[in-house]
Amino acid sequence: MQLTSYTDYSLRLLLYLALQPKDKLSSVKQVATIYNISYNHLTKVTYELGKLGLIETIKGRNGGIRLAKAPEEINIGAVVKQTEDNLELVECFNHETNTCILNPVCRLKGVLHEALTAYLRVLEQYTLKDLLTNEDELQALLKLKP
């Protein structure tokens, strides 16, 4: 299963913010530049993560963004489920658009559903804090430490 760039950027933004001092504000432009990703796309991601209560956005001249929750309170599986617009691996997962003639007897759908459930279950075992065990290396790569 491949995550969308939207989810990828969401996770990267959360990781970046988790590496910052608790009260430090970052800018979307700064994060987009560091990751070499679209500012406009990251702005949409930022807006959505704010609506989900994962990041805090402060408007104004001295505004910026920061985590709204502690890293240990942000579950990776939950973020993926909230930011992926479609977790249907195959057409038959959607009863409204399914046109596969094998559907009544197909066993593949069950196997794929089991695989998706296992995939999400693994992601749900981790929090943002779990991704920070190599904090020094991450900060060096993101040029957060001199």
From Swiss-Prot:
Give the residues the record marks as binding [2Fe-2S] cluster: 92, 100, 106
DNA-binding region(s) from the entry: 28-51
Q: Which GO terms describe its molecular function?
A: 2 iron, 2 sulfur cluster binding; DNA binding; DNA-binding transcription factor activity; metal ion binding
Is Iron set as a keyword in this record? yes
PROSITE patterns linked to this entry: HTH_RRF2_1 (PS01332), HTH_RRF2_2 (PS51197)
Kindly give the Pfam families that the UniProt entry links to this protein.
Rrf2
Q: Which cofactor does it need?
A: [2Fe-2S] cluster
Q: Where is the HTH rrf2-type domain?
A: 2-133
| GO CC term, one of those recorded | cytosol
What's in the keyword line of the UniProt record? Answer: 2Fe-2S, DNA-binding, Iron, Iron-sulfur, Metal-binding, Transcription, Transcription regulation
Q: How is the cofactor bound?
A: Binds 1 [2Fe-2S] cluster per subunit.
What function is annotated for this protein? Nitric oxide-responsive transcriptional regulator.
Q: PANTHER family in the record, alphabetically?
A: HTH-TYPE TRANSCRIPTIONAL REPRESSOR NSRR, WINGED HELIX-TURN-HELIX TRANSCRIPTIONAL REGULATOR, RRF2 FAMILY
Protein's UniProt name: HTH-type transcriptional regulator NsrR
Species for this entry: Halalkalibacterium halodurans (strain ATCC BAA-125 / DSM 18197 / FERM 7344 / JCM 9153 / C-125) (Bacillus halodurans)
Identify the taxonomic lineage of the organism of origin. Bacteria, Bacillati, Bacillota, Bacilli, Bacillales
